[in-house]
A protein has these predicted regions:
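Alpha/beta-hydrolase superfamily serine-hydrolase fold, recognizing
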Residues: 1-171
């Protein structure tokens, strides 16, 4: 899944102006597995992979994702998700923070599973420790399925944060 998503972002960057887009304003968002993929995109080495500027993504929101895949390999999921050591390393955003060139919002709800909460807190702490801009948002009273709904409202927990990150928030 990561490879086609990366190719898509590279394509959007190269073609955005053809359909009225601005390649200098690419932001990514994902929740759950999409939160993991947003993290992968934000920590991609765009120069090495696509010969593009390192900072093609200007910001992102990673909501309720997995950012270190080692625990996935140790869980019951290992019966149907098989990773090699190399895949685990390559697909763990937390291990590639040297390629993070944009502010990031990491979010989760207080009613989510402890592992989603831990992964989000650990990822945000690692980003901060790397000296990169990060905002950790905790959605009080939201579960894994409800928190994403706040993105669709400009005053919701996620909606407000994303609009501010994109400098589109109304004063």
């Amino acid at each position: 899944m990561a490879a086609p998503v990366r190719r898509t972002v590279a394509w959007v960057y190269g073609h955005a102006q053809r359909f009225g887009g601005d390649p200098q304003r690419i932001y990514v968002f994902g929740q759950s597995s999409g939160g993991h993929l947003a993290g992968v995109l934000l920590t991609t080495d765009w120069r090495k992979a696509f010969d593009l500027p390192a900072d093609i993504i200007k910001g992102g929101l990673c909501c309720s994702g997995m950012f270190d895949l080692k625990p996935v390999r140790l869980s019951v999921r290992s019966s149907y998700v098989t990773f090699t050591d190399e895949m685990e390393h390559l697909l763990s955003p937390q291990r590639h923070l040297d390629h993070l060139h944009a502010p990031i919002i990491v979010a989760y709800g207080t009613l989510e599973s402890p592992e989603f909460q831990r992964q989000s807190c650990d990822f945000a702490a690692a980003v901060q420790a790397a000296g990169k801009p990060v905002q950790l948002l905790v959605g009080e009273g939201y579960n894994h399925f409800e928190i994403v709904e706040t993105l669709g409202h400009p005053y919701g927990v996620l909606g407000r944060a994303v609009l501010a990150q994109m400098q589109l928030a109304q004063a």
